[in-house]
UniProtKB/Swiss-Prot annotation:
Family in the record: Belongs to the bacterial ribosomal protein bS16 family.
GO BP annotation list: translation
Domain of life of the source: Bacteria
Tagged with keyword Ribonucleoprotein: yes
GO terms for cellular component: cytoplasm; small ribosomal subunit
Name of this chain's protein: Small ribosomal subunit protein bS16
Keywords per UniProt: Ribonucleoprotein, Ribosomal protein
Length: 122
């Protein structure tokens, strides 16, 4: 599978990245199939080869999260709606218990409203 990913280059603590198409099993800084752009996070400079990127995307290349973000900002792909964060099992159990208590409380209040108290004094 072809991946669109960032290839790091530059000096220590002054990294820049090339946007490349490469095989998903190759190393991050290995030899790419094609260079498709450039990104400098310090200056926010971005250069994209839009024709080549559209071609690779149409062929089924999968962008990484960082590349997807750059492509969304560049207008090459639509923004994706990311799923909500996965909550741990303990928090899910607590949420279920709290919801069950709320339902029971509401049911008890509804039952109390239905049965009026007998205040018939003669």
């Amino acid at each position: 599978m072809i991946k669109l990913r960032l290839k790091r280059f530059g000096k220590k603590r002054e990294a820049s990245f090339r946007l490349v198409a490469c095989n998903s099993t190759s190393r991050r800084d290995g030899r790419p199939l094609q260079e498709l752009g450039f990104y400098n996070p310090r200056t926010k400079e971005t250069r994209l080869d839009t024709e080549a990127l559209r071609l690779r995307l149409s062929q089924g290349a999968q962008p990484t999260d960082a590349v997807r973000s750059l492509l969304e900002k560049g207008g090459l792909i639509e923004k994706t709606v990311r799923p909500a964060e996965v909550v741990g099992k303990a928090k899910q159990a607590e949420a279920r218990k709290a919801a069950a208590k709320n339902v029971a409380k509401q049911a008890a209040e509804a039952k109390a409203e239905e049965t009026p108290a007998d205040n018939t004094e003669a």
